[in-house]
Amino acid sequence: MEARHMLVTILLLSFVFMNIMKVEAQKVIGYPAIGRDGARGCSPKDPSCPQQPEKPYKRGCEKITRCERDRRKQAHLRNPRKVLDVVAVMAKAKQLY
């Protein structure tokens, strides 16, 4: 009799646990803001939208890469001594590592 009582208790607890898991698994995260009005983009109707810059930021060339020289296809150094100093520092750093 005791074994039958234990088996019924285990089955009952299993049934309750499975129902709880089934309810939890059915919860869905939705997108109510998009479904209601649609996504709000930049338009004349939405003046609070930040304006996009005309020319987006674009990083220029570093002095050490001499991009200006590369565009002109000529070896033009404004300050050759400074370039030699940079090359010496880079060579010394390479020796340290």
UniProtKB/Swiss-Prot annotation:
Coarse class of the protein's main subcellular location: secreted
Molecular function as annotated in GO: hormone activity
GO cellular component annotations of the record: apoplast
Keywords in alphabetical order: Disulfide bond, Hormone, Secreted, Signal
Superkingdom of origin organism: Eukaryota
Claim: Thylakoid is one of the keywords in the record: no
Function, as annotated: Cell signaling peptide that may regulate plant stress, growth, and development. Mediates a rapid alkalinization of extracellular space by mediating a transient increase in the cytoplasmic Ca(2+) concentration leading to a calcium-dependent signaling events through a cell surface receptor and a concomitant activation of some intracellular mitogen-activated protein kinases.
Family statement drawn from the similarity comment of this UniProt entry: Belongs to the plant rapid alkalinization factor (RALF) family.
Designated name of the protein: Protein RALF-like 2
Gene name of this polypeptide: RALFL2
